[in-house]
Amino acid sequence: MKTMDAQEILRCYAQGQRDFSHINLVRVCLSNASLIGAQLIFVDLGGANLTRAQLDSATLKNANLALANMTEVCLIYADLSNADLSGANLVGADLTNADLSGAKLGGADLRKANLSEASLRGADLRGVNLIEANLTNTDFSEADLTGAYISDGAVINVVNLS
């Protein structure tokens, strides 16, 4: 797996490259970075800082984002299917229409996150914090919500829990 640093990935993105699959970006700082539409399949972003990064329509299938700081990250229409977000900080993240099917989110902090229209079908949400999250039309079918915190101001409208 090739390793890149933040400057290198941002330079390549600015030059038009969008496919960064199978790259090692462990603990990289990409806060406030704009990587809209980037292909980050099987990327290792464990412990990375993605605070306020713009990752709309990005593909992060099977990515490792465990323990990543993703506070206020923008992941509208992003594909995070089968990604590992265990213990990630997603406070205030915008995951509107995101695909998180089969994702591992155990212990993740999603307080005040926007998950409207998102798919969490078959996701592992054990112990996840969803306090004050927007869960309008969110698909939780076949998801494991054991020990999840969902009260205290969560917006729940037409949620699929089948």
Curated annotation (Swiss-Prot):
Boundaries of every Pentapeptide repeat domain copy: 33-72, 73-112, 113-152
InterPro entries associated with the record: 5peptide_repeat
Keywords, comma-separated and alphabetical: Repeat
Transmembrane segments: none
Pfam families registered for this protein in UniProt: Pentapeptide
Domain of life: Bacteria
Protein's name in the database: Uncharacterized protein slr1851
Organism: Synechocystis sp. (strain ATCC 27184 / PCC 6803 / Kazusa)
